Every structure is written in C-alpha cells, then in structure tokens.
Design a protein with these regions (language model features):
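Acidic (Asp/Glu)-rich catalytic clusters
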Residues: 5-9, 33-41, 61-85, 98-100, ...
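Acidic/histidine-rich catalytic cores of soluble enzymes
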Residues: 10-13, 28, 44, 51, ...
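A short, acidic, flexible beta-alpha connecting loop/helix-capping segment that sits on the rim
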Residues: 20-21, 304-314, 342
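The substrate-binding groove and active-site-proximal loops of carbohydrate-active enzymes
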Residues: 21, 56-60, 111-120, 165, ...
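Active-site acidic/histidine proton-transfer and metal-coordination neighborhood
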Residues: 27, 31, 36, 76, ...
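Conserved, mostly hydrophobic/aromatic
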Residues: 37, 45, 74, 84, ...
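Glycine-rich, proline-tolerant flexible connector loops at the mouths of alpha/beta enzymes
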Residues: 47-70, 90, 145-152
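C-terminal helical cap(s) of enzyme catalytic domains, especially alpha/beta-barrels
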Residues: 314-337, 341
Length: 357
C-alpha cells in the first residue's frame, strides 16, 4: 500500500433517476423530478443520458449554456448532479449476435437492424458523454462494457482455445479510443461490474484493464447487489479494488438457495428466483461494512441509490432509501480516539524506548 490513506466522508444521499422517469407527473421532466427527489431528502441525482424527457445529451455535448441551465434547475432544488450514465449506449459497444434483437431497442430507430451503424451511434454517444460531463463539471461517468464472451460464461460445450482472449482483445480495441476521449476531458469512465457484461467480476475487469494498458480512466462502478447474486465476496472486492472504485450504487439483494435452484435461477421470474434485487434495507447486503470500508479507503464520491425490487413500489423504496443512506454515511474523524492519552514523546525518546538511542 502506497503511503497512508486519508479517510473521506462519502457524499449523499443521491438517487439514480433511470428507474423513475415516466410520462406521468412528477417524473416526466427535470424540474418536476428534481423537486420530487429534493422533497425526499436527496442531495444529488444521477441522470440517464438516453432519456430526452429529462436530459438532452447532444445539447449537453455542444452547449455550455444548456449545461448551465441543467445545473441551475437542480440547484434551485438544492441538488447536485452526481454523474451521467450511458448504460444502454455502452451495452451497444459490443453485442454478441445471440443478443442482437434483444438489445436493438436500446438504440435510436434510425440505426436499428444495422449492427455496424448501431455501434457507431453508441460510440458517438459515449464520446458526447465525455464532453458533456466536462461541460457539467463532473468527475466520473457510468456505463456498461457490453459483451462478446458472455454467452460462453459457462464452459460447456468446451470453449475453443483462444475464444475468450479474442473476445477481450476486441472489446479492448473498441473501448480504447473512447477511454482516450474521456482522458482528454478529464473524466473517469466507470464500468458497472454486472451480469450480462463481459466485465462482470474482478477477474474479468483485470483482463480488460490489462488489454487497455492499465488506462487510468478505466475504473469501476461498485454495486454490491450484483455480487450477492453471483456469491462473490463484495467486502473483499473493496479491499482488492478500492483504488479503481470511483462510483457507488447503493442497491440491495438477497440470495436464498434451495434444493430446487441456485445462482442460475431456473429460468424463473424475479419474484421466484433464489437471487433477487431488493429495495434497500430489505435484502442481505451489509451496508454498514461497505460504508466503513469505502470511507476508510478514502472514497469521496456519491452514495447513489439504485432502486430495483420485485416486491416494493419504487416510491416507497425511494422514500426509505434517502433515510437509510443518510444513516449509513460516516462523518470521518479528524483525530484519533485516544489522542487524550498522547504521551508527547519525540524521535529521540522513541529510540530510547526501543533501546537503539
């Protein structure tokens, strides 16, 4: 470990708006959804860049005036913009043919049914997101890696030699120019470590990071819920990768295996799966330990609620989420708890104590 880590107080609570944007009030415009979030006690919002009902990515990448207007709206409700997200566009950087139809709807209509044009559009979206993030004064950005190797995550039938390496080589080739654009704009690109993506655990992140030559803008969005569902130790993950974790989704989950199903879920709907996402506080994630570790390692980003639950309503989840995150944020100490007993010795005294003076 290099030097001494300085503890930081995590910012929050904030909320990811993707699951809440709707055609009905108060979720259909930026001012109304901002007021709603502020009234619930949130201090920040994370904005999905693909939903023109609340945000125009093209304008944000071309107009500082528009960005100032967005920030002004949020500030009028005592909110900050935490980050932008391109989860849907990032997914389209790499799509295996098996998922081509399923993911095609993530793109604008004019490039659908054309994988090459669709990917070019997605690349443009990511590059615009880098510029927009700079225009908005942000530090980090959330996305998905996309996937070429995911259909082969289970090694049956036996994978051809070199198949996975070829997939990751190609994935890195596609992302390197985008990472360079983020570097030019001073923004960390944070891949959410997520099932369905080639970057779905620590090892796959390392495989990708090596292929992009340890690019300093290649970082992680940490979401413990995805680790619960694959039975990965989400606390050890922080110990290993804390220097790459630049974003944090506060999302809960539970895993209750039985004699009938385990991590694969038996093709069941979310309600009947052994592993399922839950509203914050209703699952098994140890958020006290997570907030302690992240604070201790000096993470000073935002604690952003991502609500997903197959039982509880989003409105109730958002209401409870603000309070729960507030309860978990640690105001880190600036002094040692036993400073009152400091002996006041100096270097010479230390040498005498050790018998080396």
């Amino acid at each position: 470990m290099k030097g001494t880590l300085k503890m930081k107080t995590i910012k929050g609570p904030a909320i990811f708006l993707a699951q809440f944007v709707d055609d009905k009030q108060p979720f259909c415009s930026l001012p109304s959804i901002a007021k709603w979030a502020s009234d619930l006690g949130y201090k920040g919002v994370q904005i999905p860049s693909w939903d023109n009902r609340i945000f125009d990515l093209e304008k944000a990448s071309e107009s500082k005036t528009y960005c100032d207007e967005v920030l002004g709206i949020l500030q009028s409700y005592n909110l900050e913009l935490t980050e932008l997200s391109t989860h849907l566009q990032g997914q389209l950087i790499a799509v295996h043919p098996a998922y081509d139809i399923s993911f095609d709807g993530f793109a604008v209509e004019k490039v659908r049914n054309n994988p090459i044009k669709r990917r070019e559009w997605a690349e443009d979206q990511l590059n615009r997101a880098a510029v927009a993030s700079k225009n908005l004064g942000l530090k980090a950005h959330a996305t998905f890696s996309g996937a070429l190797a995911w259909p082969y995550v289970y090694p049956w039938p036996q994978r051809p030699k070199g198949l996975i390496e070829e997939a990751f080589d190609e994935l890195a080739k596609r992302w390197k120019p985008i990472l360079n654009t983020f570097e030019e704009n001073g923004i960390d690109l944070c891949y959410e470590i997520h099932p369905g993506e080639d970057l779905h655990d620590g090892i796959t992140f390392e495989m990708f990071l090596e292929r992009v030559n340890n690019h300093q803008r290649c970082n992680m969005l940490y979401d413990p819920s995805h680790f619960v569902l694959q039975q990965l130790n989400y606390l050890d993950h922080i110990d290993i990768y804390h220097d790459k974790i630049k974003m944090f989704h506060v999302k809960d989950a539970e895993f209750n295996s039985s004699g009938r199903q385990g991590v694969y879920g038996g093709f069941q709907p979310w309600l009947k799966r052994a592993g399922r996402f839950r509203s914050i506080g209703d699952g098994q994630v140890d958020f006290k330990a997570i907030f302690s570790k992240l604070s201790g390692y000096g993470f000073d980003g935002w604690a952003v609620l991502e609500w997903e639950c197959c039982i509880k309503s989003p409105e109730q989840g958002a209401l409870e989420g603000s309070k729960i995150i507030n309860q978990h944020i640690i105001e880190v100490t600036e002094k040692a708890f036993d400073d009152f007993a400091e002996s006041g010795v100096d270097e010479n005294t230390n040498k005498l104590i050790l018998g080396i003076g």
